[in-house]
Amino acid sequence: VVFIHGGYWRSLDKADHSFVAPPLHDMGACVVVVNYALCPGTTESPVTIPDIAHQMVKAMAWTWQNIAHHGGNPKNVTVAGHSAGGHLAAMLLACDWKQVDPNIPAHWIQKALSISGLYDLTPLRKTPFLQDSLRLTAKHARMASPALWPRPRKGVLYTVAGGDESPEFLRHNRLIHQVWGARTVPVCEELAGLNHFSIVTDLTKKGTRLSALTKALLDL
């Protein structure tokens, strides 16, 4: 499992999400929790969401090349993420890996889990507290919106959101299911009693719906 943290692409760190590793390991997975540069970066080295997506592609290419040395199986990798990380997980599912590295199978990533993910970034350009950091252009918003892409040819995305999340997060959860369809998104659920933050900890608890869905997706 490669897990990508959230934080609206502008905050938090992999260290804040290391708690997801032990329960996933207990399910039988080799776990990689990745970092990325945060928006807006610096004047000398600005960071955009497409830049972050490219960093995640490079991180996944590293995983393909190296995970076997750490006890993982490069042919059975699930990418998961929360919030902004869920958005990036959906993007990676749709990636044509042959364009990245001819040695990587075109549809290498077959399984993705998006927890409270975002799939259409165009409305964020009208959200001042985010736009100040993200500096999304219309072009970048379209480029980085999985809901505006054709559905992936192969692979499945499980998408979930907490029942107590904002209407916009619930809309995004339904949106990707509507756009990509039930064949690609066979699981689209709202988990009752969970908000945008408690849903992540639910992943780590045995016996929860999210834990069960994760285990089923991993198929370990």
Residue ranges and their predicted role:
Residues 1-220:
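Alpha/beta-hydrolase superfamily serine-hydrolase fold, recognizing
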